[in-house]
Structures are given as C-alpha cells and as structure tokens.
C-alpha cells in the first residue's frame, strides 16, 4: 500500500517533468540483522532491503546512504539521529551525485569540508533516548556545529504550526541556524539537533542570494533531513523543505511543487517511516 502511494506521487512528478530521488536514512539498526540486544528481533535491516528492492523493480532512483557510511558509528549514542558530521557528508555526497548523474552545476566549493568551520563541543548533547534514561546511564554526546566559512546571504520563510509565518534575512547563522538552541550545554528540555532550522516545520523556503542562477529543489523529509537540508541550502538558489507531518496549509502540495518549478524533488526519510502511509500522501 505504501509503495503504491510512492508510485502515485512519482507518476504525478513525471507528468510535471520533474526528476525524483529517494534518499534513505538507515537508522542504527539498518546495517545488519543483529538486534539491539539478545532476545530482541530487528526487522529494520530486512525491511530496508525489501523496500529498496521494490524501488529497483519500479526503476525509481534512490540513494541507500548505508553505502556512504561506515556503519552505525555515524549516529549519536544518546539519540536516534545521525550526527551533524554525517549529515554534512550526506549533503556533500548528494551534491556530487547531482553534478555527476543529473547534470547539475553545483559549485564544488560548497561541497568541500575545508570551506566550513567545524566547532565541536564536548559532552554537549543529550539526545531523545538519553533524556529518557538519564545522562548517568546513557552518557553524553559531543555536538559539532558546522557552518560555512564563506560569506552567506539568505532570505528564509517558515510556516510553523506553533508560530505561523515568519521571515529571516541574513547569514547562514542568522537564518538557517537557530541561536536560541544551546549547542554548548546539554539539556533535558531541548535538542541541539534542532539548532539547524530551529525544528520541524510544515514548510520552509530558503533563497540563497549568493547563488545567481535559478537552481531549485523541493525536499520532502522527516527529522533526518533537518541538518542535511540546511547544508543543501549552500548548493542551490532555492530550497523548499516540506514535512508532511506538520504541513497544514490549504494549498495542495502538488500545487506547491508545481509553483516552485524545481529541478528535482527529493525524499529524505528515516527507516521508521516506511510503515507510515501518511508520509507519502501527496495531495
């Protein structure tokens, strides 16, 4: 049923002449059949393999990000999300793939880690699982804030379930980042992971004023796509980010995509949403 939902959307995208790429974030249990502990079964690994095999049969382009990672070490110990360093590597890998396989012309400088500042704060992050068990059981993670070392200038518009419409202008740090998120000291009340974008929103649109072409992508994502899409904003003139879980506008998503007229529509989903029909319900 879920696969049919994806096929339905892809058919509509093809009619519009828009290439589509599905990007699979694996989750910690997606690298082997081994369970999290003795006696607990792990269905994630086989479910991922089966799902991607179906995409192969349907000739749908996808990226299995497990092939770009060395294993579950790319995730936080206290959280289910991948680290910001992993997110940067995935975003840069996507940029190189789009250049080599899809005819994009992304500036290689935006893909080069040496053009970014990596500031690591020790014992600064207590993730979702860590907040449930406590820091003395789970320990603490280091948290790395990655920002461009080059000049940036953005206009960002956000549609939030809680705060409505807002706009930001300025540098990457002033627009894509949220300075209210503490990335230096761990917290039981908030997550440094959301220092990128500020959280999950129904829709966010970033216009990069330093890129003077008309390059544009639409990314439909869950929380695994938050830092990844933040880094993608340095590669395109316009990036539209949509989270179906929080999208409440009366405007149909198909119309939003058509108006954006993107060069590509991209899904970035973790393995936990393969069983959620609503995540592929594009109206």
Label for each model-derived stretch:
Residues 1-283:
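Extracellular glycan-modifying ectodomains
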């Amino acid at each position: 049923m879920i696969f049919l939902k994806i096929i339905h959307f892809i058919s509509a995208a093809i009619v519009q002449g828009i290439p589509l790429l599905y990007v699979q974030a694996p989750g910690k249990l997606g690298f082997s059949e081994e369970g999290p502990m003795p006696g607990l079964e792990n269905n994630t690994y086989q479910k991922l393999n089966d799902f991607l095999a179906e995409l192969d049969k349907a000739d749908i382009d996808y990226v299995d990000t497990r092939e770009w990672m060395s294993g579950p070490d790319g995730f936080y110990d206290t959280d289910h999300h991948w680290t910001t360093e992993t997110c940067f590597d995935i975003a840069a890998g996507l940029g190189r793939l789009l250049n080599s396989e899809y005819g994009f012309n992304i500036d290689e400088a935006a893909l080069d880690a040496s053009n970014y500042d990596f500031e690591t704060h020790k014992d600064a992050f207590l993730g979702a699982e860590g907040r449930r068990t406590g820091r003395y059981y789970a320990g603490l993670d280091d948290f790395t804030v990655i920002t461009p070392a080059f000049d940036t200038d953005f206009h960002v518009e956000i549609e939030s379930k809680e705060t409505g419409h807002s706009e930001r202008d300025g540098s990457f740090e002033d627009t894509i980042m949220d300075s209210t998120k503490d990335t230096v000291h761990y917290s039981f009340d908030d997550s440094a992971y959301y220092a990128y974008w500020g959280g999950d929103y129904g829709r966010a649109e970033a216009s990069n004023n330093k890129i003077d072409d008309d390059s544009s992508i639409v990314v439909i994502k869950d929380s695994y796509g938050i830092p990844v899409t933040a880094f993608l904003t340095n590669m395109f003139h316009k990036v539209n980010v949509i989270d179906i879980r929080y999208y409440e506008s009366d405007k149909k998503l198909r119309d939003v995509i058509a108006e954006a007229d993107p060069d590509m529509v991209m899904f970035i989903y973790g393995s936990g949403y393969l069983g959620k029909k609503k995540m592929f319900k594009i109206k």
